[in-house]
C-alpha cells in the first residue's frame, strides 16, 4: 500500500479510538475486541489461541486482503494490575505488555489513535454487605418483561439479553459472583479475597452501533 493510500486507510478508521471511547465515558472493561490497519503492527505472526502464551491475549490475526489486523484482549493481560480492569489509564500498559512478552510488535501510539473497538464488555463491581447469592437468587426469580430473555450463567449467576436476532442490536447483561468465578478459573492474576462478596456486572456490546447507543459516543 502506498503512503498516501495508507494514510487514507488510517483516516477511514478514526471512529472509536481508545482515548475518545475511554475518556468520555470513563468506562472499565473486562474485554475489548479491536481491529486496526496493518500499519499499526510492525510485526504480527498469526497465532492460534494455544500458541499465544500470554494470558489475556485471546486471539490475534492479520487479514492481508482487507489490510487489517484483529486482536481480542481481556483484563488478564494486565497481570498483577488485573483488578483495575481495562481502562483509559492502563490500556497503553496492556498493549506494551504484548510487545514485551510475545513476538508481536505493535505501534502502540498508532493503535491507540486508529484502532477501532468492535466489541466491549463494560464492567463494574458491586461490593455487597451480604452473600452475593441472595442478590443473584432474587434476580433469577423476579418477573421480567417478555422481550427480555433470562438464562442461567454457570448455575449460580444470571444473564439477561434481548431477543433481537440481529447481533448489531442485541445486548447481554450478566451478573455473577466474582469470587466464585475467580475460584473456578483459578485466576493467577490476583488474590481471591479481593473479590469476596463482589457481584460483577458486565454489559456485552458486540457492534459499533450498540457501543455508540449505550455509551453515548
Region annotations inferred by a language model:
Residues 1-217:
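Structured, helix-rich domain cores that form ligand/interaction pockets
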Amino acid at each position: 500500500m502506498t503512503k498516501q493510500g495508507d494514510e487514507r486507510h488510517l483516516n477511514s478508521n478514526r471512529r472509536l479510538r481508545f482515548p475518545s471511547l475511554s475518556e468520555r465515558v470513563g468506562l472499565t472493561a473486562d474485554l475489548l475486541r479491536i481491529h486496526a490497519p496493518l500499519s499499526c503492527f510492525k510485526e504480527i505472526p498469526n497465532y492460534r489461541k494455544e500458541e499465544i502464551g500470554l494470558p489475556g491475549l485471546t486471539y490475534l490475526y492479520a487479514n492481508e486482503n482487507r489490510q487489517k489486523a484483529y486482536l481480542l484482549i481481556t483484563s488478564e493481560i494486565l497481570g498483577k494490575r488485573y483488578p483495575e480492569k481495562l481502562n483509559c489509564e492502563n490500556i497503553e500498559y496492556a498493549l506494551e505488555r504484548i510487545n514485551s512478552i510475545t513476538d508481536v510488535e505493535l505501534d502502540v501510539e498508532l493503535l491507540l489513535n486508529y484502532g477501532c473497538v468492535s466489541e466491549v464488555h463494560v464492567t463494574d463491581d458491586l461490593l455487597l454487605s451480604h452473600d452475593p447469592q441472595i442478590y443473584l437468587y432474587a434476580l433469577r426469580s423476579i418477573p421480567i418483561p417478555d422481550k427480555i430473555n433470562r438464562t442461567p450463567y454457570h448455575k449460580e449467576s444470571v444473564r439477561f439479553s434481548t431477543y433481537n436476532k440481529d447481533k448489531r442490536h442485541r445486548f447481554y447483561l450478566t451478573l455473577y459472583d466474582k469470587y466464585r468465578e475467580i475460584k473456578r478459573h483459578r485466576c493467577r492474576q490476583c488474590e481471591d479475597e479481593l473479590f469476596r462478596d463482589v457481584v460483577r456486572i458486565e454489559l456485552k456490546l458486540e457492534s459499533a452501533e450498540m457501543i455508540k447507543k449505550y455509551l453515548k459516543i
